[in-house]
Amino acid sequence: MALLLCFVLLCGVADFTSSLSITTPEQRIEKAKGETAYLPCKFTLEPEDQGPLDIEWLISPSDNQKVDQVIILYSGDKIYDNYYPDLKGRVHFTSNDVKSGDASINVTNLQLSDIGTYQCKVKKAPGVANRKFLLTVLVKPSGTRCFVDGSGEIGNDFKLKCEPKEGSLPLQYEWQKLSDSQKMPTPWLAEMTSPVISVKNASSEYSGTYSCTVQNRVGSDQCMLRLDVVPPSNRAGTIAGAVIGTLLALVLIGAILFCCHKKRREEKYEKEVHHDIREDVPPPKSRTSTARSYIGSNHSSLGSMSPSNMEGYSKTQYNQVPSEDFERAPQSPTLAPAKVAAPNLSRMGAVPVMIPAQSKDGSIV
């Protein structure tokens, strides 16, 4: 009887306290960067909930250094979504009529800064309810690169590497062979799920096309690799070629330097010759003195000739100088030189010259 009474009392309390409630359970949500996160929040009202309906979403950032901040609010039949600058324009109610019992929101174009705890709070007096959701934003693997680290020659040791440019941990790797038998070499089986495969004592059987797939909880990426295991190269020939090439380069450089040096020396010599001061050449003899010498020599010749020898000799104009010896430009008239007395001429070093006189008939006096 006592147990039955207690059950009736508990039922009465439950009925009395039943009011607004959120039916969506708390949960953890993981989404990739750039995607849209759906945060559900559905509620039910009771007849006794007669107050105005207020819906409020808050965020607690993951760094735990900031207090809870409102990101979107519904109150008085109006929506306010300009509270949180980091989510401005990226948070919206999913329902056009939140009074119908759906206060869910979408957060678009997710960023790493959106990671945190989101709380949905619904109030309609006297009912109050809230739910929390943990949002985690992950980065999909992308920009994955496959490559050979080392020399892919027979007998060598090298590594096959698979490296994504970005991607949230944890990451899972899977290697596959796409060509020939499509079977991974037996020594590699232990590392098929590793980002690095260590190849020991490589053989030509390892040649082929391989793929590496990287994935995490929000996405995956893949890269391809073509492996060609070739015979060892002729290293002696390579070294000899490198040495010969180096010597030829040195010879060429030496020839260029020699030519440049020679050209500079020639230019320097030309400059020195161009600026060298030379002794002036003595001026040509005076035409007047030449003419006088010519006249004097003629007179001397005439003086030594007898009258009989002069009969066939044409009369020479002594007062004229042959034009072929003296062709000069006309000069401005000059004053006649002043006469100098004979004693003064002797002091000046003049030598007297005897000029034979000539009569009217041409005979020498």
Curated annotation (Swiss-Prot):
Gene Ontology molecular function: any one: signaling receptor binding
Positions occupied by motif PDZ-binding: 360-365
Signal peptide: 1-19
Membrane topology: Single-pass type I membrane protein
Expression by tissue: Expressed in heart, brain, spleen, lung, liver, muscle, kidney, testis, spleen and skeletal muscle.
Record's protein name: Coxsackievirus and adenovirus receptor homolog
Location of Phosphoserine modifications: S297, S304, S306, S323, S332, S363
Comment on protein domains: The Ig-like C2-type 1 domain mediates homodimerization and interaction with JAML.
Principal location listed in the UniProt entry: membrane
Stretches the record annotates as Disordered: 269-315
Residue stretches of biased makeup (Polar residues): 286-315
Transmembrane segments: 239-259
Complex formation: Monomer. May form homodimer. Interacts with LNX, MAGI1, DLG4, PRKCABP, TJP1 and CTNNB1. Interacts with MPDZ; recruits MPDZ to intercellular contact sites. Interacts with JAML (homodimeric form).
Functional note: Component of the epithelial apical junction complex that may function as a homophilic cell adhesion molecule and is essential for tight junction integrity. Also involved in transepithelial migration of leukocytes through adhesive interactions with JAML a transmembrane protein of the plasma membrane of leukocytes. The interaction between both receptors also mediates the activation of gamma-delta T-cells, a subpopulation of T-cells residing in epithelia and involved in tissue homeostasis and repair.
SUPFAM superfamilies: Immunoglobulin
Side of membrane Extracellular, spans: 20-238
Classification of source organism: Eukaryota, Metazoa, Chordata, Craniata, Vertebrata
Keyword field contains Transcription: no
Source domain of life: Eukaryota
